[in-house]
């Protein structure tokens, strides 16, 4: 391994003498009739023939400039509302080019002002990228990037997550480069809106797919923040500190140092107000996920995520991946991060970040659960829990792009994450059968866990002299390791008509889990004839996962003084090996606005499962699948396009799903894995239509996606009608549940999303309307009978955001969500519930520096538990005064939860139960805060 690293380093640095020819390009946009400067015009330079695009806006003087433009043939395009667009094709020699005045012809008469102004272009469509003009959305002086994107059509910011075009934003780039790794929250909450020129929304593809142009469907929704030209040589940021009642405090800041391509940012934060300007990385599954991923046997996650049927969350976001947003409960946060970006010797583009955060969470929950059972008796439970957790996260990300020459480049992406978590919890659960208390369980649990992820992607791409002929190879490696221990004590009481029964359990567990993966992918593209090309692909993956979970039962008889005994039922030593070969061929067509590709691949999988304890076996399975994929994009014109994608893929069960080790963290809800699980096959079809009318400043977006899964991995649940012996020494009390994953057909899903946005000059505001309809059918087995949980979710959202001035900013919004849930097995548990949230956000700067900010929200709930207040009013109010030069300093007093009605409500729906969850939240407090904004330009 060390020898290979040395070879790679020698290869990298031996190429330092090879330089690409790059230069600068500038010009000025002016009106043809009066030669007046045109500000905020959109200027794009597009490479010919591969259509790579770089875009910026003209300054107040009408001027624009592009740095580091490579030698080649380009098309320049300039657009602005009220003018005819212009286009020119030119050759660039890689040195410097001044294009002089570029004249735009007005489509209507203009005023006689020195500078031509007006409502800026709201958005424009550039292939698969939607670009918003930041100057078209007025925000106050201290607004963040998150405040800016809230105003943009189709963008929704809620519960710490940003969604656009119906998908969650996974990454935010700054001028095309990562900021704080893969954490979108860090960029949006910490970067000031005034530094932003454009925001681009697109589906980011892998480095290999972007190089070859072959869309493989493995995309993530990404925002690219294009900074203003005058902010690229500046230092800016802010620092703040505050203290309030109940010993509440808040301190932090971010400072950015920009000098051309060299950029450095440092951010820090400390508070006990549940403020978190970043997303935590959850390697252990302890910060909100219900799966308990990576936890020792008996481990109890501190919270729950939604089941497959859908959910509503208040006070926390859905947890579906390692990056999670704010946690419910009372959270104390300390965080520090740095981000670095620069070009080295013209050939190297380097970006790196390090982030550290520490959180302490005091969480209390009340969970009302209704079970989906086909039995004469109704069954429900109430759980009351208290937990304390102490969590540390470190993460390091780096990206190095080496432009060897005009035909070759290399990208290296190393990543390292580390997490540790110490937690304790006390849980009391009562089970009621026909409204009579049947049993009660009290569990005292504590754990200490550590997790580490290390990965690296190495990509190399080569373009041959023949147009369209390319070759690429990518090597991806990863290693993960989780370890820890836990201790659990449970007291179980069961109530009968003639007598009561009680039992206790004391145990401790150890976890040692690790795995690695090596993936190599080769792609070669050959042009066949005009507009057609063929691509050949081969991929090889080797993955090994090992999980040792050992649980020891304490001896409860102090007189015998026996040592703890290893439990074979609660322990397992398991290993899973996967070898994958994929060979595929794609045919692509690209001409006159139509791009299409058809791919067929053959995937061979060999899965070997090895158990060493408590049973010894070695089992090997092989799977072979023909997998089609189709992609099409058609541009009707420069303002509208249609995109369609179909894919068939297979996924194999994880080691956690395969390993048959009993989890008895709750004696009333036991679970285990299933060694007999097979692969699952999924079909996905997605269609998306986008239209942007620059002249009318309106935008329309529509998306619909269908999903179908064969051999879907679901749950097989057994509910005991009477005390049942599952394993030797393991008793499932009456009303208890035992769950195991199974393969089952019949999973179907549909997602749809509509968005319309328009600038309304009459009220000088942007109006955004969005709607969505989601549908899912999730099959499962309950007491040997098939149940299909069907969920329909309808959501409507309307937002009016002001565009009046930088002193007055208001947003009026309302969101209505209607949810229908049906179960084929138990019709009596069919339910529908309605949630509506309406809010008014106001930020007003008046009399030269006085500030009032108000955020009022009404929440209405119908169809949830009777214990939940159907009407909740939340109001945060603050007053402040700006002072010092350019009003850079501010002193503000804030009243949080003026009406004392803050809450945290969650509805979780799974295949076998429905939960209504209430969590503790911050109560009313007052805070005095001082903020100073740093601004130093033209360094």
Q: Which residue stretches match the model-derived regions?
A:
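Short, ordered, surface-exposed loop/turn motifs in non-cytosolic proteins
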Residues: 33-47, 123-125
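Conserved C-terminal beta-signal and adjacent last beta-strands/turns
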Residues: 797-801, 805-815, 830-939
């Amino acid at each position: 391994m060390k020898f290979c690293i040395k070879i790679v380093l020698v290869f990298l640095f031996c190429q330092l003498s090879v330089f690409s020819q790059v230069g600068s390009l500038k010009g000025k946009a002016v009106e043809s009739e009066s030669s007046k400067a045109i500000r905020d015009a959109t200027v794009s330079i597009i490479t010919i023939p591969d259509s790579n695009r770089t875009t910026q806006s003209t300054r107040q003087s009408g001027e624009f400039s592009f740095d580091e433009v490579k030698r080649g043939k380009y098309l320049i395009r300039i657009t602005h509302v009220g003018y005819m667009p212009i286009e020119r094709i030119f050759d660039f020699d890689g040195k410097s080019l001044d294009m002089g005045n570029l004249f735009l012809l007005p489509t209507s008469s203009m005023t006689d002002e020195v500078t031509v102004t007006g409502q800026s272009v709201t958005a424009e469509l550039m292939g698969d990228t939607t670009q918003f003009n930041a100057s078209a959305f007025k925000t106050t002086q201290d607004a963040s990037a998150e405040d800016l994107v809230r105003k943009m059509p189709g963008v929704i910011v809620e519960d710490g997550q940003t969604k656009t075009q119906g998908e969650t934003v996974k990454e935010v780039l700054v001028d095309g480069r990562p900021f704080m790794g893969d954490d979108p929250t860090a960029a949006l909450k910490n970067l000031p809106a005034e530094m932003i020129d454009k925001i681009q929304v697109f589906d980011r593809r892998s480095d290999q797919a972007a190089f070859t142009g072959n869309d493989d469907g493995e995309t993530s929704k990404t925002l690219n923040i294009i900074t203003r030209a005058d902010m690229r040589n500046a230092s800016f940021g802010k620092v703040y500190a505050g203290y309030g009642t109940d010993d509440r405090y808040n301190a932090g800041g971010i400072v950015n140092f920009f000098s051309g391509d060299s950029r450095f940012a440092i951010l820090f934060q400390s508070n006990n107000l549940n403020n978190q300007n970043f997303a935590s990385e959850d390697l252990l599954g302890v910060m909100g996920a219900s799966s308990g991923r990576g936890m020792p046997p008996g481990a109890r996650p501190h919270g729950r995520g939604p089941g497959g049927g859908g959910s509503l969350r208040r006070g926390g976001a859905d947890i579906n991946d390692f990056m999670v947003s704010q946690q419910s409960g009372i959270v104390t946060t300390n965080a520090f991060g740095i981000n670095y970006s620069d070009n080295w010797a013209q050939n190297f583009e380097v970006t790196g970040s390090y982030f550290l955060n520490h959180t302490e969470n005091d969480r209390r929950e009340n969970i009302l659960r209704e079970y989906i059972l086909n039995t004469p008796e109704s069954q429900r439970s109430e759980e009351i829990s208290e937990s304390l957790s102490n969590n540390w996260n470190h993460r390091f990300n780096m990206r190095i792009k080496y432009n060897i020459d005009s035909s070759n480049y290399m990208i290296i992406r190393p990543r390292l994450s580390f997490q540790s978590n110490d937690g304790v919890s006390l849980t009391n659960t009562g089970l009621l059968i026909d409204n009579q208390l049947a049993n009660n369980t009290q569990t005292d649990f504590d754990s200490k866990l550590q997790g580490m992820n290390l990965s690296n992607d190495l990509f190399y791409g080569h373009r041959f002299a023949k147009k369209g002929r390319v070759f690429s190879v990518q090597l991806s490696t990863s290693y993960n390791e989780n370890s820890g221990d836990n201790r659990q004590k449970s007291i179980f009481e069961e109530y009968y008509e003639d007598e009561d029964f009680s039992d206790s359990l004391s145990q401790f567990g150890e976890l040692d889990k690790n795995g690695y993966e090596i993936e190599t992918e080769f792609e070669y593209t050959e042009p066949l004839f005009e507009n057609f090309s063929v691509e050949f692909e081969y991929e090889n993956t080797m993955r090994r996962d090992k999980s040792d979970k050992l649980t020891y039962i304490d001896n409860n008889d102090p007189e015998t003084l026996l040592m703890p005994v290893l439990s074979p039922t609660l322990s397992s030593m398991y290993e899973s090996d996967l070898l994958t070969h994929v060979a595929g061929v794609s045919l692509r067509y690209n001409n006159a606005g139509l791009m299409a590709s058809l791919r067929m691949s053959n995937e061979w999988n060999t899965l070997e499962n090895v158990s060493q304890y408590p049973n010894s076996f070695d089992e090997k399975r092989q799977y072979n699948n023909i997998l089609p994929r189709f992609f099409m994009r058609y541009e009707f014109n420069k303002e509208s396009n249609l995109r369609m994608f179909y894919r068939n893929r297979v996924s194999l069960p994880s080691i956690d799903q395969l390993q048959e080790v009993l989890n008895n963290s709750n004696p009333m809800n036991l679970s285990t894995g299933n060694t007999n699980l097979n692969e699952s096959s999924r079909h996905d079809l997605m269609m998306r239509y986008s239209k942007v009318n620059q002249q009318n400043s309106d935008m329309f977006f529509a998306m619909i996606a269908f999903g179908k899964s064969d051999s879907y991995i679901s749950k097989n649940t057994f509910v005991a009608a009477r005390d049942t012996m599952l394993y030797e020494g393991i008793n499932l009390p009456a009303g208890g549940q035992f769950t195991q994953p199974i393969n089952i057909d019949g999973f179907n899903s549909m997602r749809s999303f509509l968005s319309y946005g328009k600038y309304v000059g009459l009220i000088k505001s942007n109006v955004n309307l969005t709607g969505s309809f989601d549908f899912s059918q999730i099959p499962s087995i309950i007491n040997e009978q098939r149940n299909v949980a069907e969920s329909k979710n309808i959501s409507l959202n309307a937002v009016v955001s002001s565009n009046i001035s930088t002193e007055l900013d208001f947003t009026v919004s309302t969101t209505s969500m209607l949810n229908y849930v049906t179960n084929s097995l138990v019709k009596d548990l069919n339910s529908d519930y309605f949630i509506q949230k309406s809010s008014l956000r106001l930020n007003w700067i008046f009399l030269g520096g006085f500030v009032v900010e108000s955020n009022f929200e009404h929440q209405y709930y119908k169809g949830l538990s009777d214990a939940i207040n159907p009407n909740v009013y939340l109001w945060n109010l603050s007053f402040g005064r700006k002072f010092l030069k350019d009003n850079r300093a501010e002193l503000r007093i804030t009243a949080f939860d003026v009406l004392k009605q803050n809450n945290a409500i969650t509805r979780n729906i799974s295949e076998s139960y429905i939960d209504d969850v209430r969590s503790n939240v911050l109560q009313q407090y007052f805070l005095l805060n001082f903020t100073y904004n740093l601004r130093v330009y033209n360094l």
